Regions:
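Intrinsic low-complexity, intrinsically disordered or marginally ordered coil/linker segments
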Residues: 108-111, 117-121, 125-126, 135, ...
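Short, extreme N-terminal leader segments that mark the start of a protein/domain
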Residues: 1-42
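Short, flexible, solvent-exposed loop/turn segments with mixed acidic/basic and small polar residues
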Residues: 18-23, 74-79, 125-127, 152-156
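Long, compositionally biased
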Residues: 192-234
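A glycine-rich, hydrophobic loop/mini-helix early in the fold
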Residues: 50-119
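Hydrophobic/aromatic-rich, well-ordered segments within soluble, folded domains that form packed cores
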Residues: 159-189
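A mid-sequence, solvent-exposed acidic-amphipathic segment
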Residues: 122-169
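Short, flexible/disordered intra-domain loops and linkers
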Residues: 39-53
Length: 234
């Protein structure tokens, strides 16, 4: 699947996948924008890949011009043959969430310094890349995995997916911890994330995410810009 690289198509994908973050009820969202953004088996050409990346980055930059004054930023984490992995987040809200010891301690054990958000995102992108196919590339030039236990990694291996990504999406701390400890098994409810504790609150949150997405999709279709969507939900 390849998606057209233009402002309307991209913004529609953002609204569909990131409305809770636009509305301020979730610190971050992650989605894949379909298309070929990394070379696999020599196809397509490097020039074609670079051209597609440049076009998408230009679209994202234009959206950031509108959203950054409103406290929202978006960036590509990883380029893959199946699509670009795009992270949309509220830096202030995310830093507040990550400053909790339940996140800080767990992330420090995986090589993150959450006091430095840009560096943490570089590290996250590197770890996702290591866990992906050989064709995947971090969107951060020269980024490497900082974990001592991953020093054995080479171009022919695939490392375990960094499930600590749940912290970077603002999921409940204990649910992220239990997901990692229990390897994604034995959960009570599966919605926006796998729930291990406080099912009732999680179900309420799932409902709010759905309602938010429906509402923002509706007013976006009436002609609102992304910035207007953010302001409408303040």
């Amino acid at each position: 699947v390849t998606r057209t690289i233009d402002i309307p198509t991209y913004q529609t994908a953002v609204v569909r996948n990131c409305s809770p973050t636009l509305a301020g009820i979730k610190p971050a969202s992650l989605f894949t924008y379909p298309g070929v953004y990394a070379n696999q088996n020599g196809k397509p050409s490097a020039a074609h890949i670079e051209e597609r990346r440049s076009r998408l980055l230009a679209v994202i930059a234009q959206c950031n011009c509108e959203l950054q004054p409103l406290g929202i930023h978006m960036s590509v984490l990883v380029w893959r043959p199946c699509g670009a992995l795009i992270y949309v987040y509220r830096p202030a809200d995310l830093m507040r969430y990550l400053s909790d010891p339940r996140a800080t301690t767990a992330l420090a054990a995986e090589g993150y310094d959450v006091r430095n958000l840009p560096a943490s995102l570089v590290h996250l992108a590197a770890r996702i890349t290591l866990a992906s196919s050989n064709a995947a590339e971090s969107a951060y030039d020269g980024s490497v995995c900082a974990l001592a236990r991953n020093r054995h990694c080479d171009t022919g291996c695939m490392c375990e997916f960094p499930h600590e990504i749940g912290y970077f999406l603002g999921y409940p701390y204990e649910d992220v911890h239990q997901f990692i400890v229990q390897h994604g098994e034995n959960y009570k409810v599966f919605g926006a994330w796998k729930v291990y504790t406080n099912v009732e609150q999680a179900l309420t949150t799932f409902d709010s995410y759905r309602a938010c997405t429906q509402y923002l999709t509706y007013i976006y279709q009436q002609g609102c810009t992304l910035g207007q969507l953010v302001q409408a939900t303040r």
